[in-house]
Curated annotation (Swiss-Prot):
This is Mannitol 2-dehydrogenase. Monomer. The keyword NAD applies. Its EC number is 1.1.1.67. The keyword Disulfide bond does not apply. The lineage of its organism: Eukaryota, Fungi, Dikarya, Ascomycota, Pezizomycotina. Catalyzes the NAD(H)-dependent interconversion of D-fructose and D-mannitol in the mannitol metabolic pathway. Belongs to the mannitol dehydrogenase family. It comes from Emericella nidulans (strain FGSC A4 / ATCC 38163 / CBS 112.46 / NRRL 194 / M139) (Aspergillus nidulans). Gene3D superfamilies: N-(1-d-carboxylethyl)-l-norvaline Dehydrogenase, domain 2, NAD(P)-binding Rossmann-like Domain. InterPro entries: 6-PGluconate_DH-like_C_sf, 6PGD_dom2, Mannitol_DH, Mannitol_DH/Oxidoreductase, Mannitol_DH_C, Mannitol_DH_N, NAD(P)-bd_dom_sf. PANTHER family: MANNITOL DEHYDROGENASE 2-RELATED (PTHR43362:SF1), MANNITOL DEHYDROGENASE DSF1-RELATED (PTHR43362). Keywords: NAD, Oxidoreductase. It catalyses: D-mannitol + NAD(+) = D-fructose + NADH + H(+).
């Protein structure tokens, strides 16, 4: 039997053919619900995270006021618009684990607006009274945030275009759209909508607020003041491993579940979301579907610190050394027993002692869960994906733990091994002599420093925007990282790693 095309009329047949391994939406859609959320940036992570939480609220708790209207701002988003439109805005989330696979057809995205076709329609949608939340997954570059000055990159041509009052109905950037819609609500006497960042950034809500208020001040100080007083921008921590969809995933969905979906999402069973309870125009009852809704930024930051230092730090440990060792996927690295022991000991002995205690959170269990997630052979999470843009990761995920360990005279040699592996990775050649590509906005400067420094860390550490000044003067740190660099250069990752395992 050929696979069934994913659309509304085929849902019953898809469910019947699924033999208990498929879920489909049975809740009202289209005109029977209100689109209370407008989401900018409908990619894999959004469709595996926020859209799934909303799907569960609609399916299990009768929520009808918070369906999602997706928005695409870039030409790349046309493909997503076309595929979702052809499937009645339905898509499949494939959860994979060592225990098997499960397919969930998600219907929480109710419509999709492609901004290049009609920018005014997007502004009007966001300004509509039914819109309570505008959520974002626009990646770091979409925030026009200068990490050195912590200010809006106001000189960017697209920001300059959006600051021109003549272009208010045809904005280009997220902040141009947000401002135009909020200005319209201001003039209509409505409340502002909540702006909810779902990007994997520290203080994502605070950054969003500062960037939008900065934009608005340049445009209209009165509206900027209104946004400052009445607008809410909750901070959040998000987590779900979501690799890019491959052609093989589309084929497997058709073969294993009988569903023809042109752009499914593949992910793991685990997902997490901690969000500050800071909304100005209502919100869904997120607590009912497992979201941790907390009272303030400090509570978010405690969860975030666990994730950044343990999950993201471990990803860094797996990625750069794993690529040097010739591995392709995350789970392959974890199949090496020495590597698995290294990861566990780094988390338990060097990172865990630095973390705050959170009521109800068992750090040991969290670490075990991470090892299980990383070991999942069905996700096929590629190392190049987690190695992307390391200049924004190592200074966040590894170096702060080293600095804190030095401060409390704790151990940090394994963390130094991770940093040394990244320094070596910058040469773009693995331990067998095979070249690989590196994607990093600072690549030219980093590679020049790596080449000039040789087997000494001083040149790379001289980049103050990444490393500051403190570590460069610590003799213990310099000795540990230099030793690791020299051992990796001489013996390679796999022969060096046993020296870092007890």
């Amino acid at each position: 039997m050929p696979p069934l095309k994913l659309n509304s009329k085929n849902l019953a047949a898809i469910l019947n053919a699924g033999k208990g391994q498929i879920k489909v939406p049975t809740y009202p859609r289209n005109g029977a619900v209100k689109e209370g959320i407008v989401h900018i940036g409908v990619g894999g992570f959004h469709r595996a995270h926020l859209a799934v939480y909303i799907d569960r609220l609609m399916q299990n708790h009768g929520v009808t006021d918070y369906a999602i209207a997706g928005v695409g701002l870039t030409p790349f988003d046309k493909k997503m618009r076309d595929i979702l439109r052809s499937q009645d805005h339905l898509y499949t989330v494939i959860e994979r684990s060592a225990k098997g696979s499960f397919a969930n057809v998600v219907g929480s995205i109710n419509s999709f607006l492609f901004a290049p076709d009609d920018r005014e329609a997007v502004v009007a949608k966001m300004a509509h009274p039914d819109t309570h939340i505008v959520s974002l997954t626009i990646t770091e570059s979409g925030y026009y945030y200068n990490e050195n000055t912590h200010e809006l990159v106001s000189e960017h041509p697209d920001i300059q275009f959006d600051l021109d009052p003549a272009n208010e109905k045809t904005p280009r950037t997220t902040f141009g759209f947000l401002y135009a819609a909020l200005a319209r609500r201001f003039k209509q006497g409505l409340n502002p909508f909540t702006v909810m960042s779902c990007d994997n950034m520290q203080k994502n809500g605070a950054i969003t607020r500062h960037m939008l208020e900065s934009f608005a001040r340049l445009r209209n100080p009165e509206i900027a003041e209104w946004i400052s007083k009445k607008g809410h921008f909750p901070n959040a921590m998000v987590d779900r491993i979501t690799p890019q969809t491959a052609p093989a995933d589309i084929t497997a969905l058709a073969n294993d579940f009988g569903i023809q979906d042109d752009w499914p999402v593949v992910t793991e069973p685990f997902m997490d979301w901690v969000i500050e309870d800071h909304f100005c125009d209502g919100r869904p009852p997120f607590e009912k579907v497992g979201v941790k809704v907390v009272k303030d930024l400090r509570a978010v930051e405690e969860y975030e610190k666990h994730k950044l230092r343990l999950l993201n730090g471990s990803h860094s440990a797996i990625g750069y050394a794993g690529q040097l060792a010739g591995f392709q996927y995350v789970h392959e690295v974890l199949q090496n027993d020495t590597y698995k022991k290294f990861l566990w000991q780094m988390m338990q002995e060097e990172v865990k002692p630095l973390l705050p205690e959170i009521p109800g959170v068992d750090i040991d269990e969290y670490c075990r869960t991470l090892i299980e997630r990383f070991s999942n052979p069905t996700i096929k999470d590629q190392l190049p994906r987690i190695c992307l843009n390391a200049s924004g990761k190592i200074p966040q995920f590894i170096m702060p733990s080293i600095a804190e360990a030095i401060w409390v005279t704790g151990p940090f040699r394994r963390l130094c091994f991770v940093a040394a592996a990244w320094f070596r990775y910058l040469h773009g050649v693995d331990d067998a002599g095979n070249k690989f590509d590196i994607e990093d906005p600072m690549l030219e400067e980093l590679q020049a420093k790596a080449k000039a420094g040789g087997l000494e860390p001083h040149e790379i550490l001289s980049i103050k925007s990444l490393f500051g000044d403190d570590l460069r003067g610590d003799k213990r740190f310099l000795q540990e990282i230099t030793t690791a660099m020299q051992l990796i250069d001489r013996d390679g990752v796999l022969k060096t790693m046993p020296k870092y395992v007890d």
